[in-house]
């Protein structure tokens, strides 16, 4: 029993991490587990007060808390081979330029920071843009390392269960959400990305509590002009074009090999994180590049086009 009951800081639930003599198909504590534990304490210690036993289990779990993502990241050993710069090209055919490198590096460091420092300020969404079947969603899923740490179930931000759908996940994909959004919902997405915590009550607790964010959000779109014509700026959205025909290998061609590559990429990112030589935002020069680059992913401004067309054809000496 010693060391078997632990609180999972990612899911905020109690896990049983060792075999305890009965059949289990999930690490998370269930009602059946509680019944077995009550029976165990009654037979071995003569304890029959259910509430006190359940309270004791919660205290023991909290004293033995752990974070599976942090444990995974801390255990990584980098082999010294650079992968962050080449990963998106290898699996999705993206460019290997400084922008693509900085975009992925920023996203990785944001995810690492959210694991070790929940609620830290990070409002960037890496957006993979390209045709269907390129492997964009699979990339985010494998990037999460454990499929249980990934979710693509966040379809609507006005869903009353949106915060519960975030719970227990590290990488969350928001597929086509920006491309199908109107002006009002774009502002809602921006506000959503900027939050550092949520306050809500989970079903088995009595009081609401602040839940600091431990996740980051990735976007994917099959539509090229998915960004809105937004005069207030789209700095949160970092688009990277994918060209599957240029990829070295499809990410699912050998999933085990892809996972090993991605694990080493996380190890490389951890070296940067441990050094402390990073910021969770672009440099001013890269921000300028981003603003220009984002125009390639916006629909044409028809009014601006009409004005430019008029000016090109205008032969007078005064415009107004």
Give residue spans per PLM region.
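N-terminal nucleic-acid engagement/recognition segments and initiation subdomains in replication
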Residues: 1-86, 98, 102
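Alpha-helical protein-protein interaction elements
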Residues: 14-15, 32, 37, 83, ...
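Feature primarily recognizes SF3-like P-loop helicase cores of small DNA viruses
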Residues: 42-67, 121, 148-152, 158-193, ...
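P-loop NTPase catalytic core of nucleic-acid-dependent motor ATPases
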Residues: 57-171
């Amino acid at each position: 029993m010693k060391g078997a009951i632990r609180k999972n800081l990612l899911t905020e639930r109690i896990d049983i991490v060792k075999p305890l003599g009965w059949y289990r198909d999930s690490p998370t504590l269930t009602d059946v587990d509680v019944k077995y534990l009550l029976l165990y304490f009654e037979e071995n210690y003569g304890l029959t007060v259910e509430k006190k036993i359940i309270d004791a289990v919660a205290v023991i779990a909290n004293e033995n808390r752990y974070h599976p993502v942090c444990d995974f990241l801390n255990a990584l050993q980098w082999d010294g081979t650079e992968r962050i710069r080449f990963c998106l090209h290898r699996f999705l055919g993206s460019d290997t330029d400084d922008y693509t490198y900085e975009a992925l590096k920023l996203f990785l460091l944001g995810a690492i920071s959210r694991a070790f420092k929940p609620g830290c300020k990070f409002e960037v969404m890496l957006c993979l843009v390209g045709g269907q079947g390129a492997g964009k969603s699979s990339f985010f899923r494998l990037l999460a390392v454990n499929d249980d740490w990934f979710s693509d179930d966040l379809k609507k931000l006005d869903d009353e269960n949106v915060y519960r759908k975030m719970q227990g996940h590290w990488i969350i994909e928001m597929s086509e959400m920006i491309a199908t959004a109107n002006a009002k919902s774009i502002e809602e997405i921006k506000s959503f990305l900027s939050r550092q915590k949520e306050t809500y009550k989970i079903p088995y607790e009595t009081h609401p509590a602040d839940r600091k964010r431990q996740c980051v959000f990735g976007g994917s779109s099959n539509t090229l002009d998915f960004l809105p014509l937004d005069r207030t700026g789209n700095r949160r959205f970092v688009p990277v074009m994918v060209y599957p025909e240029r990829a070295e290998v499809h990410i699912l061609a050998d999933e085990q090999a892809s996972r090993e590559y991605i694990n080493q990429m996380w190890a490389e990112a951890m070296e940067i994180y441990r050094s402390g030589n990073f910021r969770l935002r672009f440099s001013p020069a890269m921000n300028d590049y981003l603003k220009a680059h984002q125009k390639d992913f916006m629909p044409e401004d028809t009014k601006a086009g009409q004005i430019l067309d008029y000016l090109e054809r205008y032969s007078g000496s005064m415009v107004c």
